Amino acid sequence: MRLILATSNRGKVKEIKALCKDFKVIPYSELIEEFEIIEDASTFKGNALIKARAVFKVLSQKDEYKDMVVLADDSGISVDVLGGAPGIYSARYASKGASDKENLYKLIEDVKKSGAKGSPAHYTAAIAIVTKNYEYSVHGWMYGDVIAEVRGDGGFGYDPMFIPLGYDKTLGELDDDTKKNISHRAKALSLAKIILQTL
């Protein structure tokens, strides 16, 4: 089965490909020109569905993609000491179009401004699957703590400041195999794969 990803984020593409080896995973940007998708829902699930529906709508106008399956992910980090921020704004926390590094340093600065050296936090991943006849969504979570510093250079996004529950290293310091077993996206994808195998 061809699984078309409604993302061109290299980090997400790499992680999803590694976790979905049973499928031919193709970022939509390899099939058509990238276009802006306005993510204006108030939840991760809502934004994942917006992305999947938008890519499905454009691609379904071409005969060769009529029976495709589109998968979209919306994910982010919620920090307790910041009242759950950045939440659904994780990808644009520093500003619209901000880089991973800019978002990371903005979050570190905001945690420091709160007077804390760290805080309980969690990642959420919502995955939406859109086909010709159905829409599905699943979630995965990873709990832990953020620290107000960068440790490690692996992963992407906020990984260098997030220490998963039960570990003493950040996601930026952990190896890929360990992360595959504990990440919010891996948990959501394991549920998504159950759905995909029935299609």
From Swiss-Prot:
GO terms for molecular function: dITP diphosphatase activity; ITP diphosphatase activity; metal ion binding; nucleotide binding; ribonucleoside triphosphate phosphatase activity; XTP diphosphatase activity. Substrate binds at residues 7-12, 75, 156-159, 179, 184-185. Binds 1 Mg(2+) ion per subunit. The active site is at 74 (proton acceptor). Mg(2+) binds at residue 74. GO terms for biological process: nucleotide metabolic process; purine nucleoside triphosphate catabolic process. It holds the Pfam family Ham1p_like. Its EC number is 3.6.1.66. Keywords: Hydrolase, Magnesium, Metal-binding, Nucleotide metabolism, Nucleotide-binding. It is an enzyme of class 3 (hydrolase). It catalyses: XTP + H2O = XMP + diphosphate + H(+); dITP + H2O = dIMP + diphosphate + H(+); ITP + H2O = IMP + diphosphate + H(+). InterPro entries: dITP/XTP_pyrophosphatase, ITPase-like_fam, RdgB/HAM1. Its cofactor is Mg(2+). GO terms for cellular component: cytosol. Belongs to the HAM1 NTPase family. Pyrophosphatase that catalyzes the hydrolysis of nucleoside triphosphates to their monophosphate derivatives, with a high preference for the non-canonical purine nucleotides XTP (xanthosine triphosphate), dITP (deoxyinosine triphosphate) and ITP. Seems to function as a house-cleaning enzyme that removes non-canonical purine nucleotides from the nucleotide pool, thus preventing their incorporation into DNA/RNA and avoiding chromosomal lesions. HAMAP family: Non_canon_purine_NTPase (MF_01405). Homodimer. This is dITP/XTP pyrophosphatase. It comes from Sulfurimonas denitrificans (strain ATCC 33889 / DSM 1251) (Thiomicrospira denitrificans (strain ATCC 33889 / DSM 1251)).
